[in-house]
């Protein structure tokens, strides 16, 4: 169920308005810009998947609308589109009256087995269809992974590259510099281990694929953000090795001792380390090229400007809302909307928690109480120029 509400978190405690679903033509519904020739900021790196990573990108939007992968019960799928201007939820289709169940329809996906996810640039929608675990033993087109590009209205879909039978796209973000996609890939080996993560550059125009660099094999790596013309890479240097003979306390300690490293990674593979911290010291997220983090030792919320290499404390007061309950810490989400950081305020003594949003400009923290007309909680899925797209819990 999709709803719209005013796109300002300061006004987000209003009731949602139910969207109208209509069977209308895509051309009538969508006012979408097609690819432009040249771009003054082509070298600027941007994250074009969900901030939570490509495997969290089955729903993704821009200021005009939101794209969604719909899984059909019998294996196939479709691309759906929610248009904010008309408040309609439709197939991303070139056909008005259709069952949308074959390749003549631009919304149709032959298979979503293994996972089908989206990335979205100013000019194109990208489809990341992943391999299934059994692909190597059952090499069919339905099971094979690929990366495809199509226009914003779903037209002119082209496969840029097909994944190798044992290839896996690492669960991190997808970056784009206007001409190329950047993502991490690894190969599953016969003994169940994986090869080191490799930074892949995929040319949008013709699908030319280039391996930029191989990352340290002893660490786990994730693309988490972008800064100017570089990728922000987070690495876990000593990932916890879990086994059946470890107790619950041993597992907790091993995870807490994991060391996180932040690195700037250029499109030619050059790396510049920025900082390190233990997992139990920070909760972090990235927005507009900055790292925001809750420091668990000082009990403060900081912004680290990667440009000036200077952390600034934005909030260190008691965490309280209208109910006057005192919370001990903030756990930051990877998501941000309307320039606000989304977080969870947690009370350590009894585990009580509440969703909240922090405004870095006013340095204010507010409780999120957005509900539907029947008092169900809602989750923000995407942000438009005037509306949030939300789903009912």
Which residues are covered by each model-predicted region?
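C-terminal motif of bacterial Sec signal peptides marking the signal peptidase cleavage site
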Residues: 2-4
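Surface-exposed loop/turn elements that mediate protein-protein interactions on large endomembrane-trafficking
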Residues: 6-11, 16-51, 74-105, 136-165, ...
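Active-site-adjacent structural elements in enzyme catalytic domains
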Residues: 121, 130-134, 142-143
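Residue position within the beta-strands of beta-propeller blades
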Residues: 67-71, 126-129, 182-185, 232-235, ...
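Loop/turn-rich, solvent-exposed surfaces of beta-rich toroidal or solenoidal domains
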Residues: 329-354
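Solvent-exposed, non-transmembrane segments of extracytoplasmic/periplasmic domains
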Residues: 70, 100-103, 108, 129
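Repeated scaffold domains used in trafficking and secretory/extracellular systems
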Residues: 50-62, 102-120, 166-178, 217-228, ...
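Acidic/polar residues in short coil/turn loops that connect beta-strands
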Residues: 62, 86, 121-123, 153, ...
């Amino acid at each position: 169920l999709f709803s719209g509400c005013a796109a300002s978190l300061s006004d987000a405690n209003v009731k949602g308005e139910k969207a109208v679903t209509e069977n209308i033509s895509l051309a009538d519904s969508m006012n979408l810009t097609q690819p432009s020739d040249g771009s003054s900021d082509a070298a600027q790196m941007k994250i074009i998947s969900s901030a939570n990573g490509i495997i969290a990108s089955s729903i993704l939007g821009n200021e005009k609308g939101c794209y969604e992968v719909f899984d059909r019960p019998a294996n196939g799928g479709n691309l759906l589109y929610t248009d904010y201007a008309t408040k309609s939820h439709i197939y991303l289709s070139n056909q008005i009256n259709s069952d949308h169940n074959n390749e003549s329809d631009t919304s149709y996906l032959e298979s979503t087995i293994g996972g089908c996810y989206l990335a979205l640039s100013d000019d194109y929608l990208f489809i990341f269809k992943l391999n299934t675990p059994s692909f190597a033993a059952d090499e069919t087109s339905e099971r094979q992974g690929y990366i495809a590009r199509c226009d914003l209205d779903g037209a002119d879909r082209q496969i840029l590259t097909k994944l190798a039978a044992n290839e896996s796209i690492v669960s991190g973000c997808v970056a784009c510099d206007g001409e190329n996609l950047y993502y991490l890939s690894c190969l599953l080996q016969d003994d169940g281990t994986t090869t080191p993560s490799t930074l892949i550059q995929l040319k949008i125009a013709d699908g030319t694929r280039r391996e930029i660099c191989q990352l340290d094999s002893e660490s786990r790596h994730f693309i988490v953000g972008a800064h100017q013309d570089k990728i922000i890479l987070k690495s876990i240097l000593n990932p916890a090795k879990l086994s059946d003979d470890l107790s619950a306390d041993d597992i907790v300690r091993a995870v807490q001792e994991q060391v996180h490293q932040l690195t700037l990674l250029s499109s030619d593979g050059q790396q510049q380390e920025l900082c390190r911290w233990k997992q139990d010291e920070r909760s972090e997220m990235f927005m507009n090229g900055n790292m925001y983090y809750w420091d668990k030792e000082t009990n403060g919320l900081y912004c680290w400007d990667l440009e000036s290499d200077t952390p600034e404390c934005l909030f260190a007061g008691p965490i309280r809302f209208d109910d006057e309950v005192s919370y001990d810490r903030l756990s930051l989400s990877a998501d941000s909307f309307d320039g606000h950081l989304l977080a969870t305020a947690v009370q350590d003594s009894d585990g009580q928690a509440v969703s909240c949003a922090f405004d870095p400009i006013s340095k204010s923290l507010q409780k999120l109480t957005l509900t539907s007309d029947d008092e169900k909680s809602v989750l923000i899925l995407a942000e438009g120029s005037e509306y949030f797209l939300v789903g009912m819990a």
